[in-house]
Amino acid sequence: MSSEPPPPPQPPTHQTSIGLLDTPRARDRSPSPLRGNVVPSPLPTRRTRTFSATVRASQGPVYKGVCKCFCRSKGHGFITPADGGPDIFLHISDVEGEYVPVEGDEVTYKMCSIPPKNEKLQAVEVVITHLAPGTKHETWSGHVISS
């Protein structure tokens, strides 16, 4: 029997001796809302708009315009007002009726300001009044018709 204490453990001198290079491990990640190309809209949609903003918009005048563009996969587009002025933003949640808007569709809409500065406008309660002639229109359920 020896009266000497055992030597203290020494740190490894090479990474393979502690198993860093031997077994690759997948990094555990917390769920992210940005995974799967789902990006939250920075603009108020029908679901996130406040009650007071909805009431103000519904009491406003009805405007006429033409759909300048609309991307179903992105969920938004723009309307060119019939009386001129800058294009108006259109979110997918504010389109009424069964058809996806396409370029050239005549629409009616009301307007709501976009927070936080309330300097820009967004079209709400959008209704397609005349389908653009000679174009294919898709319903929200995926059926395609020609107009």
Curated annotation (Swiss-Prot):
One of its GO terms (biological process) is regulation of mRNA stability. GO terms for molecular function: mRNA 3'-UTR binding. Residues 62-129 form the CSD domain. Pfam families: CSD (PF00313). Keywords: Acetylation, Cytoplasm, Phosphoprotein, RNA-binding. This is Calcium-regulated heat stable protein 1. It comes from Rattus norvegicus. Can be phosphorylated by DYRK2 (in vitro). Dephosphorylated by calcineurin in a Ca(2+) dependent manner, and probably by PP2A or PP4 serine phosphatases in cAMP- and PKC-mediated pathways. PROSITE patterns: CSD_1 (PS00352), CSD_2 (PS51857).
